[in-house]
Curated annotation (Swiss-Prot):
Known function: Participates actively in the response to hyperosmotic and heat shock by preventing the aggregation of stress-denatured proteins and by disaggregating proteins, also in an autonomous, DnaK-independent fashion. Unfolded proteins bind initially to DnaJ; upon interaction with the DnaJ-bound protein, DnaK hydrolyzes its bound ATP, resulting in the formation of a stable complex. GrpE releases ADP from DnaK; ATP binding to DnaK triggers the release of the substrate protein, thus completing the reaction cycle.
Domain J, chain residue ranges per copy: 5-70
Protein name in UniProt: Chaperone protein DnaJ
SMART domains: DnaJ
Keyword annotations of the record: Chaperone, Cytoplasm, DNA replication, Repeat, Stress response
Length: 310
């Protein structure tokens, strides 16, 4: 089993802070995102590798286990001490697609619920829903003398992408060997709760907490979204239109003359759905770019501009 250096994958040191790791992930995820590299298999593999590294290093427990055991190339029997991880821990990636190193280290799948979530007992321990009817006393099984099963509510998390949360999505989860369909409403926010009444073991409820995954393109703050766009230096100086990616597609942003890097501009009504109706705004950070390579004509023009400013 080949050792995976997750710090090297993200280009950070082993002493990197949480914010350093998050920043490195966002930068690389944006660079290798499938939407920007359609049909590029190497970029897709890199994107998956970045996701695997971030899934480990962004979680304190995973990172501690990785730092303790990963560098030795020897994984303790059964994976890291404490067992597998619950759903919601893998940053939106399917852990079954991660490397053999990850599978050996962390066990890959979450217990209980297939797909993108995991069910837990009320005290937070991962549980297998099949065990709820297996004689676990207050956690399930048959009541003594009556032969009646206890009603058991189960809780879990369901991960959805930012786009799915915005548009709404149809999901299928596995509960106690049954496939249940549910609808995540459009405009759902992180932490929202969905209840499937009577669908749990013994006629209990299934309670789902929605986890909206981070998106390399957008940041959500209340009703507003924030993104960034590259603006060529001449456009920043003279003004002009640039294409901005929105959560529903793309739009045109008119950049005023004399704009500097870091300036925030607003596209009204292009943000998140409001509970009261309508949508918030999309804020766009301008990233003024300078070409690394110049044609002879461009070089001459830049030299003339430089000379004028002396």
């Amino acid at each position: 089993m080949a050792y995976k250096d997750y710090y090297e994958v993200l280009g950070v040191s082993r002493s990197a802070s949480d914010s350093d790791i998050k920043s490195a992930y966002r930068k690389l995820a944006k660079q290798y995102h499938p939407d920007k590299n359609a049909g590029d298999e190497s970029a897709a593999e890199k994107f998956k590798e970045i996701g695997e590294a971030y899934a480990v290093l962004s979680d304190p427990q995973k990172r501690q286990a990785y730092d303790q055991f990963g560098h030795t190339g020897q994984v303790p029997p059964g994976g890291y001490p404490g067992g597998g991880f619950q759903g919601g821990d893998f940053g939106g990636f399917d852990p079954s697609q991660f490397s053999d190193f990850f599978q050996e280290m962390f066990g890959g799948r979450a217990a209980g619920m297939g797909g993108r979530g995991g069910f837990t007992s009320p005290d937070g321990r991962p549980i297998d829903l099949e065990d709820l009817f297996g004689g676990l006393g207050g956690m399930g099984g048959a009541a003594q003398g009556g032969g009646r099963r206890f009603v058991q509510n189960v809780e879990g998390e369901l991960q959805v992408s930012l786009s799915e949360a915005f548009e709404g999505s149809d999901e299928i989860i596995n509960v106690d060997g049954r496939r249940l369909s549910l609808r995540v409403p459009a405009g759902t926010r992180d932490g929202a709760r969905l209840r499937l009444a009577g669908q749990g073991p013994g006629g209990g409820d299934v309670l789902l907490t929605i986890r909206v995954l981070e998106d390399a393109r957008f940041e959500l703050d209340g009703d507003d979204l924030t993104t960034s766009v590259d603006v060529p230096a001449p456009v920043a100086a003279l003004g002009g239109a640039v294409t901005v990616q929105t959560i529903t597609g793309s739009g045109q942003l008119n950049v005023p003359a004399g704009s500097s890097g870091g300036r925030r501009m607003r596209l009204k009504g292009q943000g998140w759905p409001k509970k009261s109706g309508g949508r918030g705004d999309l804020y766009v950070r301008l990233n003024v770019t300078v070409p690394k390579e110049l044609s002879e004509e461009e070089r001459q023009l830049y030299e003339q501009l430089r000379d004028l400013q002396r």
